[in-house]
Amino acid sequence: MIAISNLKLAPGADEAQLRTLAAGALKVQPQDITGLRIRKKSLDARKRDDIHYVYTVGVTVRGDERKLVRRCRAAAIVQDKAYPIPRIASPQTRPVIVGFGPAGMFAALLLARAGARPIVLERGPDAQTRSAQIAAFRAGGPFDPECNVQFGEGGAGTFSDGKLNTGTHDARIGFVLAEFAAHGAPEHITYDAKPHIGTDVLVEVVQNLRREIIDRGGEVRFGHRVTGLSTEDGHIAALTVAGPAGSYTLPARQVILAIGHSARDTFEMLHAQGVPMEPKPFSMGVRIEHRQKDINAAQYGAAAERLPAADYSLSCHLPDGSSAYTFCMCPGGEVFAAASEAGGVCTNGMSNSRRDGENANAAVLVTLRPEDFPDKSTLGGMYWQRSIEQRAFARGGGNYHAPAQLAGDFLAGRASTGPGRVQPTYRPGVTWCDLHDVLPARITDTLAQALPAFGRKLRGFDDPDAVLTAPETRSSSPVRIVRGEDRCSTGVPGLYPCGEGAGYAGGITSAAVDGLRCAESVLAALQNEA
């Protein structure tokens, strides 16, 4: 196959034109191209008067490929490599995966395809049950600490924008994207420069992945929470599990620990049992909402109506040495209630696949290091998160309403009494206040400098009517569960800390990739034991 890069089309142009452009680049006739698929697509909006899409396509052509690529500097011969999946004999003691977010799901998929018949323990419910409970909570219903945005099938990423872009360049990424597409996501996620699925589609995709895992001999147990572990001669030997019918012991010699960044009781249990872990830097801040049409105009100008909902990514390093950045930007989305503990409030952002909501939202986060934590213990960052969420719960009225403030009032140091042009989307509701009374000064001082700095980079970002909803505390794990080069815990052989909760990923795709890596290590260990 020949890959041809830097082919350009105007917004709205028929992608069938790519065949003609590819033929022109290779100096052949369009009918000489026997096959074409898009390998990458990105939007170049750097120049307002020349906004266009840039494509890389893969083509098969009649003729000698080596000779043809010499005709075009943007062409190269490529050969896609399939992700290798070994086959093993079914082990006597089945591998166990704790958690069924992206890391646990892709670990289970690989182990199931390899014939290892994994058992998945997920403390939350299946995606359909979870969706109904979250909708009821957002409408004012009761909070469930085991069924929420953090816990349940698909993990926290299911109720987000479903963004799949990642800063890593692991070869496994192509496999992850292809599997999402094969299980119900749109094909364009395999080539978009900024792929996203959307919550509405992702809820279906994760169920399809689960069905394949079960069809291949795996087992998924919902409502099963790990409460302890035991070892034999230093090696993991069993898990204590709280299930719907009571507590039980599950023998296990290979355990992938993919618990997510919000399983605080599990962090405490692991720490109490001596599993090596350490505090790590993470970030906290607020969610900011603008009208999506204002972001579109700022990014695209007059071309906005012909283009999809605009996104942004901003960062700044401030004179006092602090830094801030935007994260998990959700075009046309909503701010979501993301609490996982009773008596706490925290936020997240989500978008559906169409990204057609009135508002844009993003986290505005302040980078925090262990030396910033009031509590210097291993779990000090986690306890700081919890205390801020509890303060927000109280300031919001004790009913899971979130504290909110207009950006103009925040910068002026006065409490807000209601919305302006931007209507908040957080449900069950917001309580207008002064966020300086909710968040630590370490965070508010940095945000007060960052908002105007971002406004200089993106017109209108510091719009006085922009809504700040707090707190955003769960951007990443506050701890790292230490593992070695074999991906095993340095203190408990057979235990594989994995994904975002263990401190080795940040986002859906990188977590899924880490799940594959850990599953590969488990398969290697099982083959050595055979």
Map each language-model feature to its residues.
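Residues forming the flavin
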Residues: 1-53, 57-183, 187-530
